[in-house]
Amino acid sequence: MQKKKLLVTASTFPRWKGDTEPRFVLDLCSHMTDRFDVTVLVPAAPGAKDREVLEGVRVIRYHYFPIRKWETLCYPGAIVPRIKEKKIRIVLVPFLFLSLYFHLFKILADYDIIHAHWLIPQGIVQSFFSKPYVVTGHGGDVTSLNKGILKALKIKCLRKAEHVTVVSEDLKGKVQELAPQICPSVISMGVDTGKFGRQHYVPDYFGQKSKKVVLFVGRLAEKKGVTYLIRAMKEIDAMLVIVGDGPLRHELQAQAGELEKGKVKFLGGKTHEELKVIFASADVFAAPSVTAKDGDQEGLPTVVMEAMASGLPVVASRSGGIPQLITDGVNGLLCEEKNVRQLKDNISKLLNDEELYHRLVEEEKKTISNYDYRTIAGRYMEIYE
């Protein structure tokens, strides 16, 4: 029997094999190739191939600006942070919208099912076609930019969709604030639980010697709250390892420079393979996320799931969809946004209370089994059918 053809549109996707860009859309798609013929349509990026196959998924990268080296709106990182970093990039936005529209116009008829990840721009552009589609809200695409024409276009996108999904219960409420008649399904992104674990542990991987290691992985942007984590580490006898890049890197490095030498290490972006070792070789994972000034919030961070799948206890803030994943004192520890004292106390508890440490790790194993990509992909495929 011939497989149905699935077209997935997204704006965050690996640019090549071994890229440091988030790969959750690729992970989801690669778990569907047994039942669907999957194609992903994503923006082009300097150095990336226009056409290739990654893990059984056909990838089409569309160009959106005449000068190719200026196609920097989406990578590395995401559209809104890229614009914040350099305001001039906003001139690329209409080119991206128009190019996506024309590429969809050319190929939509070839596909049976359409799935748009993020309301902006994929969902909005898709709403200008009559073909039914599924749209998924991931976080800031739902919670921020809710004024004027963009808000109206987002509401149109939600109302026209055949099915709306969001990655957290928190985002479900935010969608219903925009369009009260819409009842989204809550289906998170996931984690390939078989690929993470303590089997990847490497002794003294960070050069920490006898010190414990607190780990952060993520984009160095406002909503990640790394500035509060650095402040919390001032009185903690441990090393902080920061993995990732972003517009706040230089500012955060300057802040870290005020602490004792060697207390904070910035490793930059790392590949998926490197992250397996990094997670397994740390002691505690911290996700001190906050609500950004423009309303941008976490959805359900995949890095938290990856930490849990690696057997790493998590300290996180009550921000966005995180409390859906972490229950305070049961499978992790939670603190209020921007509360440096609570963040410090929770990290200290995990570093000094061995019984608590192991109890939380055992509970998070039970939690994360529900977020394996085989389960998540199955839920999406039920919607497609």
Regions found by a protein language model. Give the residues of each.
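Acidic anion/phosphate-binding donor-loop and adjacent secondary structure
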Residues: 68, 145-148, 176, 191-205
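Short hydrophobic beta-strand element within catalytic cores of glycosyltransferases
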Residues: 304, 309, 313-316, 326
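N-terminal subdomain of nucleotide-sugar transferases
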Residues: 1-63, 234
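Acidic donor-binding loop of glycosyltransferase active sites
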Residues: 280-297, 312
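Nucleotide-activated donor-binding/catalytic signature segment of Leloir-type glycosyltransferases, i.e.
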Residues: 253-274
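A short, well-ordered alpha-helix in the C-terminal region of glycosyltransferases
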Residues: 342, 349, 356-370, 381-382
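A conserved mid-protein helix/loop that constitutes part of the nucleotide-sugar donor-binding site
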Residues: 23, 212-235, 247-253, 341, ...
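Conserved acidic donor-binding segment of nucleotide-sugar-dependent glycosyltransferases
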Residues: 325-329, 333-340, 348-355, 369
